[in-house]
Amino acid sequence: GNISARIYLHNRFSVNKQGWFPWVYEQCRIVKGMRILEIGCGDGTLWVDNIGQLAMTGKRNEFSGKKKNIYIELTDISEGMISDARRNIKKATESWKERDIDVSFRFRVASCEKTGAKDESYDLVIANHVLFYCKNVNKALDEIVRVLKPGGVLVCSTYGSRHMQEISRLVSGYDKRIALEADKLFEKFGLDNGDKILKKHFSDVE
């Protein structure tokens, strides 16, 4: 679908040699014992691309206890995306049975504005190129604040007005009827206004 095609495009032509999903994962600073919520998880590529790093962090030891070391809940408004994410992550974690990896995944259909989670449930919420799709960005951020534990962290990403300018011009030159982005989503939540929007909900924005 469109999401998978866009991920391929970014992976194939990005100037960031580290790769987008490894970079996002690095910003999350995941440690043992974390409870994590990803909203708008898509097909689960964030976790599939970083499955080795996650396995290293989640490897069980004598200090881990009986509870799952890392709990990850993936949500998306699309049942199809949740189905894809479940399948992709199941395949990526097939080898974990023999390796004592203490990480659990849960998958649910839910919107950004109504996650269905309890108050103060998560140490980390991830919204990777998602917030600008929400009907009401401020309502979605209120929901994120509600489900984060005190001291919890939101890692979110967006883009700016100059995003993919070169390929947009190339495609437009080929056929002006083709538009890579029908809506200017960066106007809703982008690099130019994102920090201002976030500061209405969070005291510390980096």
Predicted features along the sequence, with ranges:
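A generic alpha-to-beta junction signature in SAM-dependent methyltransferases
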Residues: 28-30, 54, 141, 148
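Class I SAM-dependent methyltransferase SAM/SAH-binding core
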Residues: 35-114
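Conserved class I S-adenosyl-L-methionine
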Residues: 1-34, 45-49
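A short acidic, Gly/Pro-enriched loop at the edge of an enzyme's catalytic core
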Residues: 113-125
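Conserved catalytic/acceptor-binding region of the Class I
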Residues: 138, 151-206
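A short SAM/SAH-binding and catalytic strip from SAM-dependent methyltransferases
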Residues: 124-138
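Class I S-adenosylmethionine-dependent transferase superfamily signal
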Residues: 50, 144, 198
